Regions:
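Short amphipathic alpha-helix that is part of the acyltransferase structural core
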Residues: 1-11, 95-126, 232-241
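N-terminal charged segments
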Residues: 1-77
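A short, internal acetyl-CoA/4′-phosphopantetheine-binding micro-motif in the GNAT/acyltransferase core
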Residues: 44-50, 166-173
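Conserved acetyl-CoA-binding loop-helix of GNAT-fold acetyltransferases
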Residues: 53-59, 174-190, 208-213
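Conserved active-site alpha-helix within GNAT-family acetyltransferase domains
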Residues: 76-81, 179, 202-220, 228
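Conserved catalytic-core motifs of GNAT/GCN5-like acyltransferases
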Residues: 82-94, 199, 217-231
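A conserved beta-strand-loop-helix scaffold within acyl/acetyltransferase catalytic domains
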Residues: 127-137, 141-169
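Conserved hydrophobic beta-strand within the GNAT/NAT acetyltransferase core sheet
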Residues: 163, 196-200
Length: 241
């Protein structure tokens, strides 16, 4: 007889844990499926083992023909869903990093979003949208008045906060700005009694080396997946009615 399943950790499904926890005020819900507003974050919270009803709810929430990001999902998408993006990723957690404030770092807010979007467009650290800054603290470094590096907070499972949007203008790379900002953001997270974590692509060896040098350790491999919603998704709730 099979024993009990091991208890799931909140970092195993961090988007769902965020949207049912500290970020619940952002959540748009249909059934057991949750999402952030489209101008805040693309991430969706899908149950660990979604059934046909969950996929139907996901389709209704996202819309036919639209792309559904399913970061961390390890299962198989249903027939008819077109996988549009699928790469290996890693999740790293604080393992004694030397978190510290940075004298040059400044708090970024809504008035800085145009510059933040421009920096993200030029450096491609991952999704950053007009209201992503509302998810937590974002810090930046300016040179000559221009924003040249930034990092901030994204997913927020209970007790944990993800560091994201870590990027540096190509002209200012090699000065250690990204590492300094990661440590500064981590300091704020630690001050709240929470633990920093982050994600990156498994092939992004430079970023992984940087994070490990700062004191992060690999917790698990993961998957960055997206699938296109088909035009029609059966809803199991209506079968036999």
């Amino acid at each position: 007889m099979a024993g009990p399943r091991p208890e799931r950790h909140v970092l195993d499904n961090p988007a769902l844990a965020s949207l049912t926890g500290p970020h619940a005020h952002f959540a748009e819900r249909r059934g057991r499926v949750l999402r952030y507003p489209v101008d805040v974050s693309p991430w969706l919270g899908l149950p660990d083992e979604p059934d046909a009803d969950d996929w139907a709810d996901l389709a209704a929430l996202v819309g036919p023909g639209e792309e559904a990001p399913l970061a961390g999902f390890r299962g198989r998408v249903p027939d008819g869903w077109e996988v549009t993006f699928d790469i290996a990723g890693v999740q790293l957690v604080d393992n004694g990093i030397a978190a510290a404030p940075d004298a040059e770092a400044v708090r970024l807010g809504p008035e800085d979003v145009p510059e933040m979007l421009d920096l993200v467009e030029r450096t491609r650290p991952g999704p950053f949208l007009p209201r992503t800054v509302e998810l937590g603290t974002y810090l930046g470094i300016r040179r000559g008045g221009a924003l040249v590096a930034m990092a901030g907070e994204r997913l927020h499972p209970p007790g944990w906060t993800e560091i994201s949007a870590v990027c540096t203008d190509p002209e200012f790379r090699g000065e250690g700005l990204a590492g300094r900002l990661v440590l500064a953001v981590a300091h704020g997270i630690r001050e709240r009694g929470e633990t920093p974590f982050l994600h990156t692509g498994a092939g992004n060896t430079n970023a992984i080396r940087l994070y490990e040098a700062l004191g992060f350790r690999l917790r698990r491999t993961t998957r960055f997946l997206a699938a296109r919603v088909p035009e029609h998704v059966p809803d199991g709730r209506h079968v036999g009615v």
